[in-house]
């Protein structure tokens, strides 16, 4: 695992992520400020120090995939996409939940905002899909690049997911556990 030490810049950026999230919900007049504020440290740390991604090529095959299972916490991801240079602006954050033409709807929508890997909303959907993404990645690597040394294939990307207890409760734990031990997920 990569060694990590938080810097003063990281601390300031995390505080800014919290303020931007709370402000966007306040401007919208509705939404969920608690999750984006509490998830700001982990989301910032993942996006800035661990997740392999390229804002100039959001569909790069070798990128890691990040799924925010609890779609109601979408500001968590929007703020990180803004910080990372995916083309979101402060005005986009101010227009959170701003209607049909917003780039920052109440739940992440695949195809609408660059950097969003999938639409999430119902609890458990993102968590279960992340497991599907991991199976797909493993299958794709085995099919298209089985001889490459570990870590050297574009198909060696990671699947990152943030989920809560509601997501886990919504998915059959026993079913997932059976597959997890078979596939080393």
Residues covered by each model-derived region:
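Cationic, low-complexity basic patches in intrinsically disordered or flexible, solvent-exposed regions
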Residues: 184
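Conserved small/polar residues in nucleotide/adenosyl-binding loops
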Residues: 174-181
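Short acidic, Gly/Ser-rich segments with clustered Asp/Glu that frequently serve as metal-coordination loops
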Residues: 166-172
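Acidic-residue sensor for enzyme active/binding pockets
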Residues: 117, 169, 180
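Residues at alpha-helix caps and immediate loop-helix transition turns in enzyme cores, especially N-
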Residues: 77, 172-173
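Thiamine diphosphate
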Residues: 1-160
């Amino acid at each position: 695992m990569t060694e990590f030490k938080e810097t003063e810049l990281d601390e300031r950026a995390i505080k800014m992520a919290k303020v931007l999230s709370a402000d966007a919900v306040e401007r919208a007049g509705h939404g969920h400020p608690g999750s984006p504020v509490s998830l700001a440290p982990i989301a910032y740390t993942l996006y800035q120090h661990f997740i392999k991604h390229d804002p100039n090529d959001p569909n790069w095959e070798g990128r890691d995939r990040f799924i925010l299972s609890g779609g109601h916490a979408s500001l968590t991801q929007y703020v990180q996409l803004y910080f990372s240079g995916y083309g979101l602006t402060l005005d986009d954050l101010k227009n959170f939940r701003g209607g049909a033409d917003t780039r920052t709807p109440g739940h992440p929508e695949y195809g609408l905002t660059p950097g969003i890997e999938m639409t999430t909303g119902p609890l458990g959907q993102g968590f279960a899909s992340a497991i599907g993404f991991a199976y797909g990645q493993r299958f794709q690597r085995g099919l298209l690049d089985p001889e490459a040394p570990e870590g050297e294939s574009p198909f060696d990307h990671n699947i990152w997911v943030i989920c809560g207890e509601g997501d886990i409760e919504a998915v059959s734990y026993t079913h997932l556990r059976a597959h997890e031990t078979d596939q080393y997920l």
